[in-house]
Structure formats: C-alpha cells, structure tokens
C-alpha cells in the first residue's frame, strides 16, 4: 500500500500558475491581478472608521477630526458598521433558509421535490409541537414549511430552535436581551439601530450584532439545514474526491457553484439520467461530470458523493481549465468576474436566481415549480456546448485527493454508537465522545469554518491550523470552504490519521473516521451548534465550559461575521485570522474580545499570525480542561 501524502499549498499554487498562463493567452483577468490593483486598501475602511450612512458625509475619523458631522465618534461608527455587516450576513443566510422552506412547501409525491427523510420531518414537527398523527407526509411537510416561514416574521416570542440549548442558556440570552426573536425583525432592527441618529453606544450595537447573528444560526440557517435534510436526505458518510483533478477531459463538465441545494440537486438528478448521458455520448463525450465549488458543492458532495472541484478562490480556475462547458450558479460568493472570464473560453456562465444576477451571464430563472424543466434545459445547454471547446486551451491539473464526507450530527452519533457496548451503555448520545475528551485521549475540538481571503495565502491557514490541531489530539469539524481546503489537501482521507497524535489516531482507527470531519456547507455550522448543545446536555455542562472553540482563519464575507456572532452567542470562543474592521475603536475591540463573556460566556480572539493563532486555540482548550479538572 502506497504511503499517504498530503497535497501541499505549493502544489495548489503551481497548478494555479499553470492555469493563469492559459488565461494570459486569451487576455483573461483573474483575482490575483485585481488584488494587486486594489492594494493598498483604504486604511479608514480597514479600521472601520469611515461612515457613509447619511449625506452630510462621508465622514472619516482622524486625530484631527475625532467626530463626524453628527458628533458620532469612532466607537459608534465602528459599532454601526459592524452591526450592518452582521445584518447583511444574517439576511443572506436566513434568506437561504426561507428558500428551502418554500421548496419544502412545494414538495409533493412524484414532484420535482420530494420528502427524502420523513422520520426527520416528523421528529422536528414533534419538537415544534405540531400534530403528526394520521397526517399525510406531504400535508405535514407543507404545514411545517408554513410554520417555519412564520419564524421570519412572527410578532411575539423567540426562535423555536432555542429550546435545543442546555437548560439555563436560553434564559441567559433572554436576560441579556440577545435571544433572537423573529428573524426578519432582528435584521430590520439592526438596520434601524445603525441608521443616522439612532444607536451609537458600542455595547448596544454589539448586543444587537449577537442577537442578529443568533437569528441566523438558531433560526434561518438551522431551518435551512434541517429542512434540506428533510428534502434531500440527512447526510451520512460517503466517499468522494476533491480538487480540480476531478474534472474529466473526455466528459461534459458541469460545475455547480453557490449555496442553494435546490438547484444543484436537480442538476445532478438530470445529469445522472440515461437520457442526458446518451445525449452527451451522441456529441462525442464519454459522459457527464458534475463537480462543485463553494457550499453548493458541499451540499451535493455529502448527499451524493459529487466531487468538489474547489473552494471560493478556485471558482475562476474551473473556467481556466478550458474544459468547463457550463458553470451554473445560484446565490452568494459568486464572482461577477465569471462573466467576462467565461467569454474568453467556450464556457456558459448561467445564473439562475433573481437575487444573484450579473452582467455577461445567461439567465435561466429557476424555481421549485419548473425545476425539472429548468435543470434539463441547463444540462442540455452544457452538452450542446461540448463541441465548442478549444483543445489548445484545455488543461486540467491532475491534483485530487480522496475524502470521506457527510458527517451530520445524526451520522456522528451513529459512528459513536458503533464503538459503544450496547449491552451496557446508552446509545444515541454523544457520551462516547465525551469519554474520549474526559480521559484526555482527545483534548478537545475545533470547529473550523469560513472562507478564503486573498489577504491570507489561500488555504494555507486552514490546512496548517488543522495539521497542528490533529497532531495535538484535537479533532476538527469543518464546513464551507474550510472543509474543501481540508479535502483538497487530503485531510479528509482516513489515511490522514497518520498525521494525528497517538490519542486521536486511535480514535480514528476505532471509529473508522478521518481526523477532519466534514459537516457540510456554511449554513450547516448550525449542525455544529446542535452538536455542541448535545455535548453540553449529555455532560451536564454549559456550552461555554466545553473544551471546544471555533475558528475562521480566512473569513471574508458578511455571512462570516454573522456566523462568528452566533458562535460566540452560543458560548463558543471564536478565533479569527482576519480583523473584522474594528481596530479603529478600542471600545469595540474590548467588547468583542472580552466584554461579550458576561452575556454569553465566550468572546473573539483576533490574531493574524497563524502560528500564534493555533497556539492560542490550543491554550484555550487546555484552560477549559483545567477548569473542568480533566
């Protein structure tokens, strides 16, 4: 058996450099060049001290001008900007959840969308107090979808899923006025507070930032995750591959990109059909390969084993291969640059959502009622485009790694049951994992999430942090582009156990798992919150006592700020490798790195030096162990 070997970041970079050579031949632009054109960045923006929320400005804070025209100081301006950043992210993730609710409402027997996990639907219905006895599963699905949609605008009460928290934690959030109410209310309240002439008190702005994030994580995102499982199946371990080498030169290559599984699931369904495969062969291809970029890739990887072509900063690379017949996108994290870039090649750049329309794209509006018809048309368009390839521009880097993905909370519990003595011990709990942590076999866990960011060497922070954590017997649960970085490197191959400390290696062998567990897309960080809550309840602890931390070393988007706020709001210390534009306010820095502890039991740590960042995470995990006496 050959020795296991990681793919290095240097190898990623060599592959990209070769693709950029192809791009140069056709005059293509790429993010590497645009970054240079935008450097150096605006220092006022980086510090968060630029205000443009009214037409008396824009105002920027300097030692000579410490207040804006209205009198707001740096602390208020930075706080308002942070809150607006959060609101943008919470609205985006929660709108994803809303779309999934609408799709569930359209589900029907024999229709485009069907209920794949009726047991989970019934379980959530009972959790919400919805009667299930004697109901047709689709009648129940429609009732649950409508009930879920009411969570966005209900006039009273808090998010239903907050009841999943350990006893006392929900009450603490209510007491500190950060328990999320209606999802749309928290977004609207945030924008109201950040309006000219409203809040400029940093403490109030940070509290609402956490509350708004919590509406995302324990509201919109959690519904997006749970109802996607109902519609498309709850993920379980499945083997796949990752990196650009998953594209096949002899096949029609369709790349799905974005975040909404309603689109990608249907594309995969039709690309797998005999009719479309036969049609592809009729135009000279050997078959059809669907691969993915970003979170929609994570969605279809963990349910179907569809290979992952790459993460956020590789979206241009799939076009630069010259072998991509169509890149089909839905919403979020889509470069407008894909339009002009695709025109340099034969690639069809197809947008499908009225929420994400860009120039130089072909727009095919996708909706639940016509999903099958839309998907079939898109797959056929890609096949018809195969003949337009320019062979001299085709180059697919032969980099790929094996990955085992699909570790939902349910799948993790099932894995734990497999190493439990069912004659003696209780099954269906997280207690075996707690025993590993208590005994010190595993020191703790890191939830590694987030994006790529050109400010940091792409993928390097994710991969290096993970390598050091697993070497120190700290298990990683990963989602989003962080998960794809791990998969591309090989850290989701079960053979990566050889990179672990002795304790974690033994656990990986016994449970037959990789040391980095793929939990899904960015909305699926809600799975991590559910897992943390289950660990706390099974141990009798509060979440903030667990030797668990969160980390987003290369975060980039507004969604990441919302995520960070709900992870902190849940009680999990969160470590960032990129400053969240608050350095211009000492009060905001203090509140986010220490002040939030009195409300949630957790706070942020920001450290741009990756070596120092991982040491701080390990140190925090060990501090928590010491406090527990383990």
Description of each model-found segment:
Residues 2-630:
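Anaerobic metallocofactor- and corrinoid-dependent redox/one-carbon enzyme cores
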């Amino acid at each position: 058996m050959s020795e296991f070997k990681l793919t290095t970041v240097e190898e990623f970079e060599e592959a990209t450099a070769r693709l950029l050579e192809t791009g140069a031949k056709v005059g293509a632009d790429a993010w590497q060049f645009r970054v240079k054109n935008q450097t150096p960045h605006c220092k006022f923006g980086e510090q968060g001290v630029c205000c443009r929320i009214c037409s008396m400005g824009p105002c920027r804070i300097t030692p000579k001008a410490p207040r804006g025209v209205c009198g707001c100081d740096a602390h208020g301006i930075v706080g308002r900007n942070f809150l607006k950043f959060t609101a943008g992210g919470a609205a985006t993730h929660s709108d994803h959840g809303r779309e999934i609710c609408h799709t569930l409402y359209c589900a029907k027997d024999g229709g485009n969308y069907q209920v794949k996990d009726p047991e989970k639907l019934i379980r959530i219905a009972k959790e919400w107090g919805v009667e299930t006895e004697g109901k047709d599963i689709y009648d129940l699905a429609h009732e649950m979808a409508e009930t879920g949609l009411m969570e966005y605008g209900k006039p009273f009460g808090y998010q239903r899923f907050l009841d999943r928290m350990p006893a006392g934690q929900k009450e603490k959030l209510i007491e500190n006025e950060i328990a999320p109410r209606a999802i749309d209310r928290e977004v609207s309240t945030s924008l109201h507070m950040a309006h000219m002439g409203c809040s400029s008190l940093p403490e109030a702005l940070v509290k609402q930032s956490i509350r708004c994030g919590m509406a995302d994580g324990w509201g919109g995102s959690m519904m997006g995750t749970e109802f996607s499982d109902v519609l498309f199946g709850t993920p379980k371990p499945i083997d796949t591959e990752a990196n650009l080498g998953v594209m096949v030169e002899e096949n029609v290559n369709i790349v799905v990109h974005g975040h909404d599984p309603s689109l990608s699931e249907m594309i995969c369904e039709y690309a797998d059909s005999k009719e479309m495969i036969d049609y592809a062969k009729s135009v000279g291809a050997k078959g059809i390969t669907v691969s993915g970029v970003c979170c929609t890739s994570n969605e279809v990887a963990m349910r179907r084993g569809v290979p992952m072509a790459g993460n956020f900063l590789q979206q241009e690379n799939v076009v630069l291969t010259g072998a991509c017949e169509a890149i089909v996108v839905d919403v979020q994290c889509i470069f407008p640059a894909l339009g002009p870039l695709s025109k340099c090649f034969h690639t069809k750049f197809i947008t499908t959502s009225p929420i994400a329309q860009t120039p130089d794209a072909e727009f095919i509006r996708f909706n639940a009622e016509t999903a099958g018809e839309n998907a079939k048309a898109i797959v056929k368009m890609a096949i018809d485009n195969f003949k337009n390839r320019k062979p001299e521009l085709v180059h697919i880097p032969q980099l790929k790694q094996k990955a085992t993905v699909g570790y939902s909370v349910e799948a993790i519990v099932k894995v734990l049951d497999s190493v439990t003595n069912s004659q003696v011990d209780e099954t269906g709990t997280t207690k075996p994992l707690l025993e590993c942590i208590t005994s010190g076999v595993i020191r703790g866990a890191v939830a590694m999430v987030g994006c790529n960011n050109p400010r940091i060497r792409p993928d390097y922070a994710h991969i290096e942090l993970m390598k050091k954590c697993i070497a120190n017997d700290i298990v990683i649960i990963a989602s989003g582009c962080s998960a794809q970085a791990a998969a591309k490197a090989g850290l989701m191959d079960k053979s990566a156990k050889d990179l672990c400390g002795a304790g974690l290696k033994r656990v990986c062998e016994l449970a037959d798992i990789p040391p980095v567990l793929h939990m899904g897309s960015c909305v699926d960080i809600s799975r991590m919150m559910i897992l943390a809550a289950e660990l706390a309840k099974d141990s009798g602890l509060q979440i903030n006592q667990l030797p668990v931390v969160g980390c987003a070393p290369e975060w980039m988007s507004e969604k990441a700020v919302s995520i960070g706020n709900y992870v902190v709001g849940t009680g999990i210390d969160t470590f960032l490798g990129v400053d969240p534009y608050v350095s211009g306010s000492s009060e905001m820095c203090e509140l986010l790195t220490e002040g939030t502890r009195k409300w949630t039991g957790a706070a942020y740590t920001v450290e741009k030096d990756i070596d120092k960042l991982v040491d701080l995470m390990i140190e925090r995990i060990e501090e928590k162990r010491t406090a527990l006496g383990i």
